[in-house]
């Protein structure tokens, strides 16, 4: 019935409402909703001969889901009595329409997310990078300390399961303990705490489970994801104003698991000024887009070194942070200069924001203020979110 000539059925053509109802059975497996409610599909016309014309907008014209969606539309409509032919007029969404789709997809992800022990009013920030060596953990502990110093209760989750470093960088050596909480049958792990200024840090890390920090954790993907689930479900976090998650580098199992379990997370991307680091860091932003997470902004770490004579030297290049922020349509939250005291603070367990008034400490405090005072805008969907076509096909087959 999709050839050039409409077929004759003898039945009356369907109504717009009937066709729309059938279109609602067609799902976009990546966005997790039907193509009507996503604003992708609408009935253009229904002729007296039963020819049904559908207007279909994709996030981008070259979206690899086009073939599958076409087959799904045709199979749903062609079996309806009175339909003699189905035509599809393909188009592309505007920027505003893509933003609306992203908003709905994010809402769907939140509705479908499992319950965790993280309070619903807690702002969650995942500190991420495309690769290691950019100072992501240093940024995490200094931002956490800066937020706590002004009176906030801040959770710090060390999700870098293999490369845990948060306990040492915050000067916490106690192991995690589990105990029963009033009204809760199952014992829960209790975060280790450190008072900072007017506030409090609550810290959880696999480094607090092993015998000593030199112990290697030889865990594979499923075990990594399970560990993160336990940190979210089996830890008694209590009230938190912020939860900062020190992410492992890259875009692997832990990142995908956290995006699924905590879809209200805002991503903060750490990069150095070099172009090569910026090109790797953009993958973290792409992961956020594909997982419907918002990007709170970019932090450029190790931006420049200033000598005792006041001369500034861009040892790792310059401009990478702003370039990355511009490319992903986000904000540059700040630039942290190179100071030996930052590394020394990590070695001694005293974040520089607690011991110094120098440029690096001031940069971290300013970034924390930006985070506290800024509402993250809805991120525009930069393009099609479709992943590997085989994975998409598996999702479709499971639905059917």
What is each PLM-predicted segment?
Residues 2-40:
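N-proximal, solvent-exposed amphipathic alpha-helical segments enriched in charged/polar residues
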Residues 37-40, 52, 59, 66-129, ...:
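Extreme N-terminal, non-catalytic leader segments
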Residues 123-162, 281, 285:
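Walker A/P-loop phosphate-binding motif and the immediately C-terminal alpha-helix
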Residues 64, 209-223, 269, 273-276:
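Flexible beta-alpha connector loops of hexameric P-loop NTPases
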Residues 30-57, 336:
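Short edge beta-strands and adjacent turn/loop segments
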Residues 230, 234-237, 241-348:
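Conserved catalytic-core segment of NTP-binding enzymes
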